[in-house]
Amino acid sequence: MKRLFSNRQKQVLIWVAGGKCQICGRKLKEDFHADHIQPFSKGGQTINSNGQALCPKCNILKGSNIMNIKLRPWQYEAREKCINWLLEKRADRHFVINAAPGSGKTVAACSIAKKLIDRGEIDRVIVLAPRSEVVNQWSNDFFNITGRFMSKVTRADGDVEKLEIDVCATWHAVQGLQDSFQAVCKLTRTLVICDEHHHAALEASWGNGADSAFSNASFVLILTGTPMRSDGERTIWLSYDETNSINHPDDGTYTLTYGD
């Protein structure tokens, strides 16, 4: 396995970083370092999703430390239940986390992604969120928990599959990136995380696009704080019962109650 990043990989890394060191934020010069997020000495691969652009000083100071985040009890339980459903039972590729807004679903989802990455089950992560500001928060939390940088992409970014990195986008961007997302899921083992899943109404343009774009995803993690749809619309990936409530197996669902 090669240790050094290629020139093409370095170009992608500095593009993702916006030309700035991804630790201190200073503008990078030509002598910037293409660094392994998970150290090469600890099994880290020389791929863009495990790379970051750093100034020489920050790379030296960084050493080989990997971040650890302490989970709340419910986040730990959700992660373990999800891993058991997806990897042990393998009854279905979808897992649902139902918890109120602000409860910490993003952290729980990122910890699940890290677990799947560490176990060698996935290569890429794609996050779909409702708004740009939420997308930005995902990028920050994802890095803090996994140590991997996640780039925001829009319809204008084109061939996302060539970036070889984890990405996040709004639901509305899905239709314009449908072919690229489809290619990513066909070429790599991909976890798709759907934040505020009720935004993906089946009849809406981004709902139809998502259904096609992610049909080959290895796993789909569905986050919702609205298990019932008052408008009667159906969403992708999940079925609903006669009361318009999500109808998904209990073993494939984690629900956070107010008592928790």
Model-inferred region functions:
Residues 67-98:
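Conserved pre-motif I regulatory segment
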Residues 25-53, 64-66:
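Histidine-centered nuclease catalytic patch
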Residues 143-179:
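Inter-Walker segment of RecA-like/P-loop motor cores
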Residues 202-260:
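Post-DEXD/H (motif II) to motif III coupling segment of the RecA-like Helicase ATP-binding lobe
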Residues 90-112:
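Walker A/P-loop
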Residues 4-33, 55-57:
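Short cysteine-rich loop/turn motifs with clustered Cys
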Residues 167-209:
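Conserved RecA-like ASCE ATPase "motif II neighborhood" in helicase/translocase motors
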Residues 106-108, 121-144:
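Conserved Walker A/P-loop ATP-binding site and its immediately adjacent core
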